[in-house]
Amino acid sequence: MSGIKRTIKETDPDYEDVSVALPNKRHKAIESSARDAAVQKIETIIKEQFALEMKNKEHEIDVIDQRLIEARRMMDKLRACIVANYYASAGLLKVSEGLKTFDPMAFNHPAIKKFLESPSRSSSPTNQRSETPSANHSESDSLSQHNDFLSDKDNNSNVDVEERPPSTGEQRPSRKAGRDTSSISGSHKRELRNADLTGDETSRLFVKKTIVVGNVSKYIPPDKREENDQSTHKWMVYVRGSRREPSINHFVKKVWFFLHPSYKPNDLVEVREPPFHLTRRGWGEFPVRVQVHFKDSQNKRIDIIHNLKLDRTYTGLQTLGAETVVDVELHRHSLGEDSVYPQSSESDVCDAPPPTLTLPAAVKASAVAQSPEPAAAAPVGEGFPETTEAERHSTFYSLPSSLERTPTKVTTAQKVTFSSHGNSAFQPIASSCKIVPQSQVPNPESPGKSFQPITMSCKIVSGSPISTPSPSPLPRTPTSTPVHLKQGTASSGVSNPHVIVDKPGQVIGASTPSTGSPTSKLPVASQASQGTGSPIPKIHGSSFLTSTVKQEESLFASMPPLCPIGSHPKVQSPKAVTGGLGAFTKVIIKQEPGEAPHVSTTGAASQSAFPQYVTVKGGHMIAVSPQKQVISAGEGTTQSPKIAPSKVVGVPVGSALPSTVKQAVAISSGQILVAKASSSVTKAVGPKQVVTQGVAKAIVSGGGGTIVAQPVQTLTKTQVTAAGPQKSGSQGSVMATLQLPATNLANLANLPPGTKLYLTTNSKNPSGKGKLLLIPQGAILRATNNANLQSGSAAAGGSGSSGAGGGSGGGGGSGAGGTPSTSGPGGGPQHLTYTSYILKQTPQGTFLVGQPSPQTPGKQLTTASVVQGTLGVSSSSAQGQQTLKVISGQKTTLFTQAATAGQASLLKLPDNTLKSVPAAPQLAKPGTTMLRVAGGVITAAPSPAVAFSANGAVHQSEGSTPVSSSVGSIIKTPGQPQVCVSQATMATCKGPAAVAGTAASLVSAPSSISGKATVSGLLKVHSAQSSPQQAVLTIPSQLKPLSINTSGGVQTVLMPVNKVVQSFSTSKLPTTVLPISVPNQAAPSSAPVAIAKVKTEPETPGPNCISQENQVAVKTEESSELSNYVIKVDHLETIQQLLTAVVKKIPLITAKGDDASCFSAKSLEQYYGWNIGKRRAAEWQRAMTVRKVLQEILEKNPRFHHLTPLKTKHIAHWCRCHGYTPPDPESLRHDGDSIEDVLTQIDSEPECLSSFSTADDLCRKLEDLQQFQKREPENEEEVDILSLSEPLKTNIKKEQEEKQEEMRFYLPPTPGSGFVGDITQKIGITLQPVALHRNMYASVVEDMILKATEQLVSDILRQALAVGYQTASPNRIPKEITVSNIHQAICNIPFLDFLTNKHMGRLNEDQ
């Protein structure tokens, strides 16, 4: 029978043989069972193999799918390039053929041509596009063309577009652009011809020229406006030629714009350089008087009144306002050069007048720049005009002609740059595109350029309004852009099409704008920039490269349009753009000083305007290529992650970020994520969690659940994982778990807005080590009731707001398992549930995974797998404003302080020994409790009884609920204070509302947990107590916090309390301690073995165990200073004194284990042994610690409230100047003084050099004087003798007493204190030894005097060093401290005035 029983399928195959081994059973049964077992084994093996194969095949399919998508994307790009190339080259060839096809007009007889092509033609919508095959021109099209034309001044043919009325439907702009470009060459020639022809036909003397004045505008949403500038729109007025001959720079000298009086004193603006654009911000429409001045003085200046039309659709996209078309008759001879101008005639021949060409080129560039404003395309052109054109040429036309143009072209681009520059004076969009022309020289006009920067509206380029194309859904591409983005593609995400030119000649990636959304309109400007007609465009790549100042810059400029103009001022980073195109190489944005930082980070930045969605499939993130963003429509989220080429951003599927929130997440590899959110917090919908994958740091500051973007760039990958308990094994090793009881979450959420929560993880995983996670407070824990979106993952950048509690502590975050934990605003949390976060390390990076724990009592988390280090943060009170501070020193300490702390009690427990602590009653005082954990146990119980049992079973002192003895588990007893310390180092402080902490890393369920998981060093302290208390966990130094050592060290959780302390809000609940988990080396054993022993690092036992054996005495510390630092501030007044006191407590180099912190070196040699990076890091960490301690002191002591806290940088500098940071050995090595050093030295030396000499001569003189002056009567000497005899008697008495009493032991004085005793005796003061202990005496007073003297001299010398630093040349260390430095130092320190003659009296005679 037993054999049969043994065949149960679920049995572990390893033990299957047991059935075979049973003796005395029927052999048949045994054989059959063995056979069954074998069959079963085979079956399972086969099944496993098949499953494995299936998995592999699925994976292969996924990979293939991914590659197909990639290939498809590449094909799309290729097709766009081919099409553009085709049209471009076709245009060139046709030009040479005589532009027949190029221009529909070419078929018309010259006699009727003039009527067909009259300038007004461009203004009529029908004809507008006459040159282009398609009849419908969309506004965007026109815009793009406009850009085109802007970019290619010479593309006259296409330029007319501007005149075209906008029609949103057009999707072809890009194609047209391409075409235009190509046509440029042809059209230019034609244009020249036409210009001449038309002139001839009209009259011998005059030529008719069409001038178009138009404007584009863009609505600035209220959230994008600057505080001091509430303009509703950004607009650009442009002056250009007709579509046939867009560039007017060969006959127009300058343009004056007369603006509305409200623009005074700048209501008259002169633009001298070719892109005749003016960009401004404003809130109303008004007639603009545009005065055009011609180069030939015979042509009188003309005034054109143009009514400015602003975007009434309020879409935030750039829209074409209105255009005013004017025909002007100019003296033919004044334009004689015109025909020559290659620009106007595309003919390559024109190259001959290179200078002029250059000019046109410049114009083109500027035009391009301009165009951007009008159209999305423009941005491209503008930013890239050179690049693009050049690119285009090289890429698209691979004709020699393009080469010819090169020189000019370059110029153009440069010019453009300038102009955009010029605009920078205004906030125009372009702000970032400062393309510095490298050699503008070629343009004849270049001199004007200098002026240009001021007026030019080029600026727009980068931000250019065009980037926001008018509502037309199509993206506009500059007309000239040869690259056709796929306009048709409507990708839900808008991709910003930026084309960045990697290599001079090629356009790297144009992202496709998606037609569907208006944003998508951004055209790829780069192409546009190529002027169609202008010879310049022809540059071929290489030359263009050289000429361009910086390719990147130009690219960059063009990119900006992507972003809505003002949209991203903050992100401006030189980093590689994470923007839509993975392709970009580097884009560097330069911001002009005056400009608003509109430019978003390199092109990508501006994405935020358009939401990008990423779909998340299954828990995987699908990488979204910028071009096709997949959006899951359901999400309201507007997160627009910037995606770096390879990065993926996952938006939690279920979570809908409220659309209001626009998070711009920049992703790039190791950076920080910054999300800029509008006030709304993202809500998680459904049980999804957002996990950040590769977050190195996420910093969120500012509470309210909003994540504030800081300039930092960060990148995070967010991954969505299902909320269910995560198997720790699944994704890679778990680095650390963060457990947050829901209520605590709420508590954390209550911290005042500025609070920052840092989690640092340390684990064996090298990759996991030392990651600092800053958990945005807002995100911190607003868990929605039924969704466990842990905002803890906030690190990831999502901030979850709890739907229920939204308020500060009001609703506790919901616990795991989806059960809402209810806590009334006033009351303590009724259920504490923990959500634990696990820091997981996966190939993609480390991230926090939220682990909900089921709420129902009795359930156990099965995932009791071991976590290497768990960081638990729990703050119990739903609304306490407690501040949690954890600082890691050499012993990392976890410190929470309640706002109203009474006194702090310090409990020291010896290493692994658990002692019942008699002191418990003291602990009960609502004071701050300081727990020092030496070996691995910490316990603090605010409540009266504390029981430790060595075996880990918890005895409840109050006895209300039995605690199961399994090691890791604790039962939560509501209201019972209980502390259980299992060897697994876990302690919970429980207050009236008890929180159960369990050692088991993952097992944290309020209910009793039977699973014993081993935690490798988890210290948790939860205090749910309503009385405020402070608990400090000190984790032994062995675990080195922050340091990256491979052996897991303790990570510290820093929650700066500073801000927190101030809000003493309603709740009284104390904050709970953050559990710090110490990741120790114990390998996480996934088996739920109850390993209670925590392995600590080898060095662990050392320092901590020393005196802690019996010191159960509870020390009360006066200040709840950060962890170990106890600083007495009664006698301190100034910030300098405070700083000195704090810095002395936090040394950078210390041999003593107690003072050592994670960043301190044991000796100067060790410190100098570090490389400069580590030294700087230690210096900075020390400064940060000092700043935190200092801030806490300032906040806690009302008398310091008037002092302003210092920044970390200032503290680091101060420490360096005052000698608290050893100077870098590198800087000490400079033996040869540089001339500036010598000069500085000469300047700073006093007139009379003081040379140092020994005191011998002086002493001799003084002795001689004494001899000479010894004239006093000798009876005084007798008196002296008398006085000496009396003390002798007293001494005798003492000796007798001693004989009567027990033996007394005197500790021998140190040489220093012996010296002090001698000196004091000489002046008639005897210092009595002080009883340290019964019959133990030591010379304490002498030691104290010695120490005080040391401090005094140290203060003087350090101040003198600081004075020396001021006089030394910058970044140099003073070689020596001179007498004058010391004198200055003494004068600088107020309490040293007894050393100066400041308050000395004078005899009247002297007066």
Swiss-Prot record:
UniProtKB keywords: Coiled coil, Isopeptide bond, Nucleus, Phosphoprotein, Ubl conjugation
Spans annotated as Histone H3K27cr binding: 260-262, 283-285
Biased composition (Low complexity): 511-520
Modification sites for Phosphothreonine: T406, T477, T1204
Crosslinked residue numbers (Glycyl lysine isopeptide (Lys-Gly) (interchain with G-Cter in SUMO2)): K9, K113, K189, K486, K550, K590, K647, K771, K908, K1095, K1115, K1207, K1270
Gly residues biased stretches: 795-829
Protein name as catalogued: YEATS domain-containing protein 2
Species of origin: Mus musculus
Record gene name: Yeats2
